[in-house]
């Protein structure tokens, strides 16, 4: 069984109660993606929210005679980024469906610029762009929440959007998948990049549904806005008949389902038929493993010619898919089971048929006939216009509010902002439920606001018991000793090749905890000194996960023998 040993203080199943004292010797088993860069810059900066309003003195305690400052007034977020406001930016929207060449066009501008930054929603995309630019002799740094790969003489950066630097000046910048400003959890990071990146040219790539909102938001910034519309480069054909059985699966197919359990069930069923091997892609797989699985699926020299995946294929991976097959058009979104939205269906379906690939014409259908009407109507419909973008108070505002209310913990501060934030009609407060769960834990520890905030915005899945326990242990050890050694948390000799999907999930969880340690080590280097060890352990986890995905596949001795022969030929 793959697991690591954790010496933990217990937390509640939901991860929101206080950290409790553990019994001596009790052992707990150990389980991201948002990363945050400049959001963690400190210093209370009093902003001038209205033009020509002067520079009033603020009473942070509420006991003086000077004017009080309303820290919950978020009506003018464009004023939070003075460097960008000094520029009259040329903002170019590249909008169109999947496989329309919109991002390719923007990247051409980035390659030709004297300095620039690419901001993507996923590490996978940042990796891909950094690799592309460096190959084109454009020196490019790679910066994500968990890694910093600096290239000598770099003039460009490829970053995850949360790591976007709003204090630097660029010739050219790209924000990819800009429609994610409307994401309930991560939208604020895209809004921050949209308002805060100081670039002469800012290229925004995404769905046409975002255009009216972006144009409205940028009316107050003085930027010039252009809209370039793209059409799909290769046909996408909605089929009129379903795939009645997985026995009809063929080479190049991608079967889409929305639970980890179903992914492995379909994989097992397809492989038992003896015709195909399946690669798998889903969100909780490490990014490195997702890339490896996509590469294996695309490689025509091996037998992994079918993909079983979640909506994680919607962005970040280049895939040679002939046909998308929806096993269902419903998904559980964390609170309820609902129909897929028009945007979700179009994003996933659009992955079929890739320009200049083995399958230039894409097809899309369902397993069940009753799902076809929704599929067809969604593909014909435009995505609903986005009406609001996510927003979240800067640390400056939270820190100022904390000084005005010194008895309030971070949980109370976040709660107050959610309940009392003043917003313009273009914005909504991002969902801070997960942040508040972490805040409830760290508020019980002797930590400063800066340190609490760091843990609150860290890439932890608080809805996973093991992940929540890992964060609690890190915070507890940090508050007690100021240093967190990895050997006190993980027992690497207990990590073994998983034999079942359940054991695989535990190994994926270990990888996430190691990922969290690396993230913290890049921000608290002296307190989390074992970054190299954690990175090494992550690599081992990736290897073991790959071994499981390769080994847990064949029930046919003949097919297994053929796979072994291919492996020997490739050595």
Swiss-Prot record:
SUPFAM superfamilies with a match to the protein in the record: P-loop containing nucleoside triphosphate hydrolases
Main function: Major helicase player in mitochondrial RNA metabolism. Component of the mitochondrial degradosome (mtEXO) complex, that degrades 3' overhang double-stranded RNA with a 3'-to-5' directionality in an ATP-dependent manner. ATPase and ATP-dependent multisubstrate helicase, able to unwind double-stranded (ds) DNA and RNA, and RNA/DNA heteroduplexes in the 5'-to-3' direction. Plays a role in the RNA surveillance system in mitochondria; regulates the stability of mature mRNAs, the removal of aberrantly formed mRNAs and the rapid degradation of non coding processing intermediates.
Protein name: DExH-box ATP-dependent RNA helicase DExH16, mitochondrial
Positions of ATP binding: 96-103
Catalytic activity: ATP + H2O = ADP + phosphate + H(+)
GO cellular component terms attached to this protein's record: mitochondrial nucleoid; mitochondrion; nucleus
Disruption phenotype: Variant nuclear number and positions. Pollen development defective.
Cofactor: Mg(2+); Mn(2+)
Activity regulation, free text: Activated by the presence of mitochondrial RNA.
Quaternary assembly: Homodimer; in free form. Component of the mitochondrial degradosome (mtEXO) complex which is a heteropentamer containing 2 copies of SUPV3L1 and 3 copies of PNPT1.
Localization in the cell: Nucleus; Mitochondrion matrix; Mitochondrion matrix, Mitochondrion nucleoid
Record-listed E.C. numbers: 3.6.4.13
GO biological process: megagametogenesis; pollen development; positive regulation of auxin mediated signaling pathway; positive regulation of cytokinin-activated signaling pathway; positive regulation of gibberellic acid mediated signaling pathway; positive regulation of response to salt stress; positive regulation of response to water deprivation; response to salt stress
Location of the motif DEIH box: 176-179
Transit peptide: 1-56
Keyword terms, alphabetized: ATP-binding, Helicase, Hydrolase, Mitochondrion, Mitochondrion nucleoid, Nucleotide-binding, Nucleus, RNA-binding, Transit peptide
Gene3D superfamilies documented for this protein: 1.20.272.40, 1.20.58.1080, P-loop containing nucleotide triphosphate hydrolases
Family classification: Belongs to the DExH box helicase family.
């Amino acid at each position: 069984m793959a697991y690591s040993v954790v010496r933990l203080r217990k937390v509640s199943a939901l991860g929101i109660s206080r950290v409790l004292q553990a019994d001596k010797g009790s052992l707990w088993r150990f389980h991201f993606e948002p990363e945050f860069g400049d959001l963690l810059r400190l210093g209370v900066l009093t902003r001038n929210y209205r033009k020509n309003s002067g520079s009033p003195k603020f009473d942070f305690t509420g006991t003086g005679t000077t004017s009080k400052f309303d820290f919950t007034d978020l009506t003018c977020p464009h004023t939070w980024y003075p460097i960008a406001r000094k520029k009259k930016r040329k903002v170019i929207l590249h909008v169109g469906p999947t496989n329309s060449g919109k991002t390719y066009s923007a990247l051409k501008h980035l390659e030709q610029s004297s300095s620039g930054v690419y901001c993507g929603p996923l590490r996978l995309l940042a990796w891909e762009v950094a690799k592309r630019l460096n190959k084109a002799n454009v020196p490019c740094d790679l910066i994500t929440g968990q890694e910093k790969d600096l290239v000598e003489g770099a003039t460009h950066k490829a970053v995850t959007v949360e790591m976007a630097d709003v204090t630097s000046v660029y010739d050219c910048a790209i924000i990819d998948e800009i429609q994610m400003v409307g994401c309930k959890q991560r939208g604020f990071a895209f809004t921050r990049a949209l308002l805060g990146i100081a670039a002469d040219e800012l290229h925004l790539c995404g769905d046409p549904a975002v255009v009216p909102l972006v144009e409205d938001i940028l009316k107050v910034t003085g930027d010039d806005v252009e809209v370039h519309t793209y059409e799909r480069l290769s046909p996408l054909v909605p089929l009129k008949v379903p795939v009645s059985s997985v026995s009809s699966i063929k080479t190049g197919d991608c079967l889409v389902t929305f639970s980890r359990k179903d992914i492995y069930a379909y994989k097992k069923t397809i492989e038992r038929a003896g015709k195909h091997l399946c690669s798998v892609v889903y969100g909780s797989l490490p990014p490195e493993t997702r890339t490896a699985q996509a590469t294996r699926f695309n490689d025509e020299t091996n037998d992994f010619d079918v993909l079983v995946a979640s909506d994680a294929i919607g962005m970040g991976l280049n895939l040679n898919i002939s046909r998308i097959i929806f096993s269902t058009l419903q998904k559980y979104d964390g609170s309820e089971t609902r129909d897929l939205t028009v945007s979700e269906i179009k994003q996933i379906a659009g992955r079929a048929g890739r320009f200049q690939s083995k399958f230039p014409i894409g097809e899309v259908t369902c397993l069940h006939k009753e799902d076809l009407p929704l599929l067809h109507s969604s593909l014909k419909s435009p995505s609903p216009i986005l009406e609001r973008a996510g927003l979240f108070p800067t640390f400056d505002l939270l820190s100022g509010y904390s000084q005005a209310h010194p008895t309030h913990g971070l949980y109370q501060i976040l709660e107050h902002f959610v309940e009392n934030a003043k917003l313009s009609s273009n914005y909504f407060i991002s969902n801070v439920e997960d942040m508040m769960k972490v805040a409830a834990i760290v508020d019980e520890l002797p930590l400063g606001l800066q340190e609490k905030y760091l843990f609150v915005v860290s890439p932890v899945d608080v809805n996973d018991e093991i992940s929540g326990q890992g964060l609690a242990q890190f915070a507890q050890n940090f508050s007690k000793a100021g240093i967190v050694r990895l050997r006190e948390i993980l027992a690497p000799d207990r990590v073994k090749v998983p034999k079942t999907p359940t054991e695989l999930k535990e190994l994926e969880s270990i990888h996430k905890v190691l990922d969290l340690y690396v993230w913290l080590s890049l921000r608290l280097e002296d307190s989390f000194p074992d970054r190299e060890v954690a990175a090494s352990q992550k690599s081992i986890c990736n290897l073991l996960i790959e071994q499981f995905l390769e080994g847990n596949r064949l029930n046919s001795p003949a097919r297994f023998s053929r796979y072994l022969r291919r492996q020997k030929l490739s050595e």
